[in-house]
């Protein structure tokens, strides 16, 4: 076997393309546009309302996982699990995240060569002169098979910046999904807790109605016996009917919460029924961290920060438009007019070579696009900082709210204890004939009002606890919550 003479006489046929390819690879390590640096935010050392709160530690159960389990209610846990799997708003956000994840795969694929295969047969005809004596029909067959490879050399980093932007956008979409899940979980837990307090309110009013019915019967008997006047009967009737009306109103309120829970779980209200229970979930002890931890715990803050990263990378994409695009192409195959010798050495062909494309004039469109993307970046930075401030505000508000409700609960309980004692003394005086029934009615009304006030403030404390947990990010964490699954 002899060497090809062209190879012996001119070895540069191999060296020059290799050198060119090496230069392209080295240049492709560069990327125009700014590298990302997380914007700074002013973070206080601790929350203003943190005095008296238990500080969170790494061992606290609140730091990770299903935060709603701190209420110790198995029924609630099952409802939230159903929400996580069946809520339609969550499904929308999950689909948006899958779209963003697909864009990441598409952008990553643009970094690699594209391989194409084409094969086909064509038949063509060319008109011939009527005087032709060749006997040819003028019909020709052509067989073609071609394999092509093309690769865009990412010399200026346009494709890599695009991948960086799409990855950050996917992470932001994942954080948006977590934020929506947290919001809906919080809504369901609040509805459930309010419903359970209403169940207790309903039991209170039902027992009160029974007591008032007995009082009305007794008052009527006393009126018929001439012991009391007609006004006592009228007052007892008023007291009973007012309480019955309040009980009916609670039934409507409970139905609203029950229907809301059904829809949150992706069910029609007619398909869901939540039986009453005899207990109210206990108020949890909520540990609080330091403000800097909030930046890692809240998914909405993480989403805002990832949006900055995406905008920053898009600046590089926009600036890369000022530079030429380089594409390396290689193709080869077989072309013949006869099927029998189609795939044969004489019928092969090939081509190889680079291409360059550069926009020379665009009347300022590229410059305007860079200015637009830089303005988008500034906008996302401002949005991020505002989101952080809003997060601090929410935590401070709910911490103060819980403290105030705790103090109010103490005073409300003291008022209830006093009202119960007053009712006991008044009832004894009425039985002894010292006072009339109207005095008893007034004290009973006050006692019932205080009973309901204690339950109302308990409901407010439970709701505020949910809001505080959600404001601190629930069980979400940026270190694991921004991992994109392929």
Which functions belong to the PLM regions below?
Residues 55-71, 120-148, 271-287, 316, ...:
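Small/polar, glycine/serine/threonine/aspartate-rich low-complexity segments that form flexible
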Residues 2-7, 14-20, 26-85, 143, ...:
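Terminal intrinsically disordered/low-complexity segments used for targeting and assembly
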Residues 31, 76-78, 142-144, 190, ...:
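Transmembrane beta-barrel architecture of outer-membrane proteins
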Residues 91-92, 108-109, 153-181, 231, ...:
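Sec/SRP-type N-terminal targeting helices
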Residues 159, 175-290, 401, 405, ...:
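Periplasmic alpha-helical coiled-coil/stalk elements that build and connect Gram-negative outer-membrane
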Residues 223-227, 430-434, 471-475:
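A short glycine-centered flexible hinge/capping loop motif at secondary-structure junctions
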Residues 80, 144-148, 192, 237, ...:
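Membrane-embedded beta-strand positions in outer-membrane beta-barrel channels/transporters
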């Amino acid at each position: 076997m002899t060497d090809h003479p062209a190879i012996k006489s001119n070895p540069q046929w191999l060296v020059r393309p290799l050198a060119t390819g090496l230069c392209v690879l080295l240049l492709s390590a560069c990327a125009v546009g700014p590298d990302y640096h997380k914007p700074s935010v002013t973070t206080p050392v601790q929350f203003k309302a943190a005095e008296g709160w238990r500080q969170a530690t790494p061992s606290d159960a609140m730091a990770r996982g299903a935060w709603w389990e701190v209420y110790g209610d198995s029924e609630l846990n099952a409802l939230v699990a159903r929400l996580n799997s069946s809520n339609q708003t969550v499904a929308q956000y999950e689909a948006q995240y899958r779209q963003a994840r697909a864009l990441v795969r598409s952008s990553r694929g643009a970094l690699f060569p594209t391989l194409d295969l084409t094969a086909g047969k064509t038949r063509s005809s060319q008109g011939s002169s009527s005087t032709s004596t060749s006997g040819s029909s003028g019909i020709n067959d052509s067989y073609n098979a071609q394999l092509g490879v093309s690769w865009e050399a990412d010399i200026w980093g346009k494709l890599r910046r695009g991948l960086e932007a799409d990855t950050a956008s996917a992470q932001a979409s994942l954080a948006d999904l977590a934020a929506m899940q947290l919001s809906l979980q919080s809504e369901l837990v609040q509805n459930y807790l309010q419903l359970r307090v209403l169940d207790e309110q309903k039991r209170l009013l039902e027992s009160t109605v029974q007591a008032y019915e007995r009082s009305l019967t007794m008052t009527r008997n006393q009126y018929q016996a001439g012991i009391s006047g007609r006004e006592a009967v009228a007052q007892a009737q008023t007291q009973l009917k007012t309480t019955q009306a309040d009980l009916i109103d609670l039934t409507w309120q409970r139905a609203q919460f029950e229907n809301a829970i059904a829809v949150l779980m992706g069910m029609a209200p007619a398909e869901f029924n939540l039986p009453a229970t005899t207990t109210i979930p206990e108020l949890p002890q909520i540990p609080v961290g330091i403000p800097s931890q909030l930046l890692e715990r809240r998914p909405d803050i993480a989403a805002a920060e990832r949006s900055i990263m995406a905008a920053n990378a898009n600046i590089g994409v926009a600036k890369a438009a000022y530079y030429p695009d380089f594409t390396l192409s290689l193709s080869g195959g077989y072309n013949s007019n006869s099927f029998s010798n189609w795939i044969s050495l004489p019928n092969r062909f090939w081509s190889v070579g680079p291409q360059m494309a550069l926009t020379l004039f665009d009347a300022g469109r590229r410059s305007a696009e860079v200015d637009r993307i830089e303005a988008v970046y500034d906008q996302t930075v401002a949005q991020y900082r505002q989101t952080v401030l809003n997060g601090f505000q929410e935590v401070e508000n709910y911490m103060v709210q819980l403290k105030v409700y705790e103090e109010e609960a103490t005073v409300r309980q003291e008022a209830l204890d006093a009202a119960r004692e007053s009712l006991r003394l008044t009832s004894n005086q009425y039985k002894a004939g010292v006072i009339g029934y109207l005095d008893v009615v007034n004290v009973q009304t006050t006692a019932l009002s205080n009973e309901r006030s204690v339950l109302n403030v308990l409901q407010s404390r439970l709701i505020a606890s949910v809001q505080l947990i959600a404001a601190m990010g629930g069980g979400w964490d940026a270190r694991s919550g921004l991992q994109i699954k392929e």
